[in-house]
Amino acid sequence: MIILDTSIWIEHLKNNQNFFSKISKLLENGEILAVECIFGELLQGVKKESEKDIILNFWRHLPKEHYENIIIEAGEYSAKNKLLDYGIGLIDAIILMHGIKSNAKIWTLDNKFLRMIPEELRYSK
C-alpha cells in the first residue's frame, strides 16, 4: 500500500499530468491507503463545495487502517527521534506512524519530511 502525502494529493487534484496518470493507476489498483489527518488537511484548503465533495468521495471509498493510540505513539516516536528539531510536526509524525504500522510506502514532495522517512518506507515512482 502507498500513503499519498497532502502534497501529492494536491498535485493529483490539480490534474498535474506529472502525477495524475500514476496516481490514477494506483487508485484503480486499490493501492492507496487513506490517512485521516491527510484528508483533514485537504479539507482545510477547499475553496468550493465541489472540491469538498471530491475529497470526501475519495475518503469514503479508499481503504483505511485504524490504529488505537496512533497519535500518542506518533508523539512518542517524534520525541524519541527528535522530529521537531528537523521541522517535522505531529501531523507528519502521524503519517509516518501509519506508514510504519501498515508497512505502507509514503509518497511526499516535502523534502524535510522525506529525509525523516526510513528508506524502506519511501515511495519512489
Predicted regions and their residues:
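Alpha-helix capping/helix-boundary segments
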Residues: 8-9, 38, 70, 95, ...
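Acidic, PIN/NYN-like endoribonuclease modules and their adjacent C-terminal/linker elements
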Residues: 1, 96, 100-125
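Acidic catalytic patch
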Residues: 60-83
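Short active-site oxyanion
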Residues: 29-31, 61-62, 100-105
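A general structural signal for well-ordered alpha-helical segments in protein cores
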Residues: 20, 35, 39, 52, ...
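Short, well-structured N-terminal submotif of metal-dependent ribonuclease cores
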Residues: 1-34, 44-56, 125
